[in-house]
Amino acid sequence: MIIAAHRGFAARAPENTMAAFRQAAEFGCLWIETDVQLSADGVPVLIHDETVNRTTNGSGKVTDLTLRELRALDAGLWAGEVYRGEKIPLLTDLLALAEEFGLHLNLELKTELTDSDHAIAQLCEATAAVLEMQNFPADRILFSGFDTRTLHHMHKWMPHIRRGQLWEKIPPQPLALLQEIDAFSVHCDWLFLREDTAKSLRKAGYQVFCYTPNYPELVAHYADWGVGMLITDNPAIYRDENRFS
């Protein structure tokens, strides 16, 4: 199984910062998962929450703050003095690191935070524009999201890039929706994955990925179920268990 770094090496550095991404890359992770949102002036930035409150020294909704306002915040100090001065990264920052280390990126598009179809289209279009401008290899990108509308948009904007449908718990009959968005993979909370579901999805041709299994002994059997990727806050525990790849 592939071991991917969830929001970077989030167990060792503040999540979704360049420190966390670089630590994951230097540790040897080939895949990094992160979250993409738009600043108020339309720039793709990497942050998970709807607001900056939890992970910075500021407050307010991400989409209400300009890039200049977002970059003025400290995104590292909450995790310790050593990370003082870490900024909310741009998507372009992570792409540069990915080029340096040959990384693959799982870009979760955070559009479930809005009901606006226009806002969803804006995020998808802006993300596509950055990837095209940077000429980043399509085979090293995976788009993912809980909001199926987003994956429809990315199918339109960049049909050559793979798409993964995120669920907490996979619904009883997922195949029609997966076919509709031409999905490559299904991502779910490891706690709710069932053996029969995993095997039926693999039989139907879909990859099965799980987030965030931080206890290797509890998912050791997932490889037998056909699970291809574990997205964890702490990749080191899988190296310790000789399950790192």
For each of these PLM feature ranges, what is it?
Residues 1-245:
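Phosphate-group recognition and catalysis centered on beta-loop-alpha active-site segments
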